[in-house]
Amino acid sequence: MLHVLRPGYAGAVNGHSNNGNDDETSTTPTLYIFPHAGGDATYYVPFSREFSADIKRIAVHYPGQRDGYGLPALTSIPALADEIFAIMKPSAPPEGAVAFFGHSMGGMLAFEVALRFQSAGYRLIALFVSACSAPGYIRYKQIKDFSDNDMLDLVVRMTGMNPDFFEDEEFRVGVLPTLRAARIIAGYNCPPETTVSCPIYTYIGDKDWIATQEDMKPWRERTTGAFAIRVFPGDHFYLNGNLSELVCDIEDKTLEWCDRA
């Protein structure tokens, strides 16, 4: 079962049907899934289906996306992490440990949320970062100060898109949340001494030009534990063609940690 956590709706957790069963216990490890910018939780249903019932999966649904109209716009990665952690956090740390998976922008958010779980005394299994540059190594930093119109102009210049498309209000409303997320991504950083104690395992496509291997290697500086990088064939969304191998690696590392604990 893939559970979906919707910020802005306290206590609302919905389920998507999965091939596994729902025999989770209080000690079952939980994997929180943080989607990419512009992606919603339902995008990760196929990803979730590859896991066994030995791991509980909870995907985070961001404000301002489908079924989330009217919620506050993203202002920063740390602010969104605060909001999500406040909803995730039970009154006391659970018996089961937690792990985090984030793709693209979701990798930054997963890191920030993991820091909050760590400070609150939770047992962290690992942070799994997919196709996401390490803090301080994010490209296109100049766009962090762009207005909405500046962002739309940049899209026209970079893609050759007809600017008349942006005269359509419905089209603007549809595209601006993703562009605003890109602006937030470009402005994200954190102090160099900020680290998690759990291992960080990173994954990247060999043809990814948005987050390259060189951009991801500095994630090793963000953990006092183990670090590894694994390269798959594919582009920024390499995971779509490598679901079984990716999930197998994540599940093996998660359950190995639980066996040792």
Swiss-Prot record:
TM annotation in the entry: none
EC identifiers of the protein: 3.1.2.-
Reaction(s) this enzyme catalyzes, per UniProt: a fatty acyl-CoA + H2O = a fatty acid + CoA + H(+)
Active-site residues annotated for this sequence: 104, 208, 236
Keywords associated with the record: Hydrolase, Lipid biosynthesis, Lipid metabolism, Virulence
InterPro entries per the UniProt record, alphabetical: AB_hydrolase_fold, TEII, Thioesterase
Record's keyword annotation contains Acyltransferase: no
GO biological process, any: lipid biosynthetic process
Entry-linked SUPFAM superfamilies: alpha/beta-Hydrolases
GO molecular function, one term: fatty acyl-CoA hydrolase activity
Family: Belongs to the thioesterase family.
Described function: Involved in the synthesis of both phthiocerol dimycocerosates (PDIMs) and phenolic glycolipids (PGLs), which are structurally related lipids non-covalently bound to the outer cell wall layer of M.tuberculosis and are important virulence factors.
Name this protein carries in UniProt: Thioesterase TesA
